[in-house]
């Protein structure tokens, strides 16, 4: 079952996406919500500083940190990417510190704070990659080499990755800025796939 952090931000949209896919989920609002049924976690978009404080005050920080440290699947979108990052290049706060990347908060500034784009999502080391076109579905046993063609990217005052460490793999970039990463069973995007009708990234997460 997917636990969706629900202390602040766009958690309802992730829940709706999982409903559409027929995948069970549970909202995480307090430490007691994080039980043995949770085998994957979504960290939604929102305000990362507020979420960081509420993670501590609700007692959810430790169980989620232990989940990530155990190598279990986690998906962070926008603020969720910030919470996962090893370091922020314009903020002294560090939260889970699990994603080998330096992330820049509010990287696009106010003028370009919200915009849409389209790009391929995924990485390929050769000709053997599985390519999933719009309208198609990600296989349940999706390989590491998988490319989601023409994925719609919705940004709302999003971050981008200022520096990618060796443990992380770039999944997508826009105008030269890295906005999607994968590291083992960690998936992180600066954009909001839950605000689109395209379920492929959530399907990829559920396959991890």
Curated annotation (Swiss-Prot):
InterPro entries: Class_I_gatase-like, PdxT/SNO, PdxT/SNO_CS
Ligand binding (L-glutamine): 46-48, 105, 156-157
GO terms of biological process kind: glutamine catabolic process; pyridoxal phosphate biosynthetic process; pyridoxine metabolic process
Record field: catalytic activity: aldehydo-D-ribose 5-phosphate + D-glyceraldehyde 3-phosphate + L-glutamine = pyridoxal 5'-phosphate + L-glutamate + phosphate + 3 H2O + H(+); L-glutamine + H2O = L-glutamate + NH4(+)
Active site: 78, 192, 194
Pfam families according to UniProt: SNO (PF01174)
Subunit structure as annotated in this protein's UniProt entry: In the presence of PdxS, forms a dodecamer of heterodimers. Only shows activity in the heterodimer.
Protein's name in the database: Pyridoxal 5'-phosphate synthase subunit PdxT
Protein's gene: pdxT
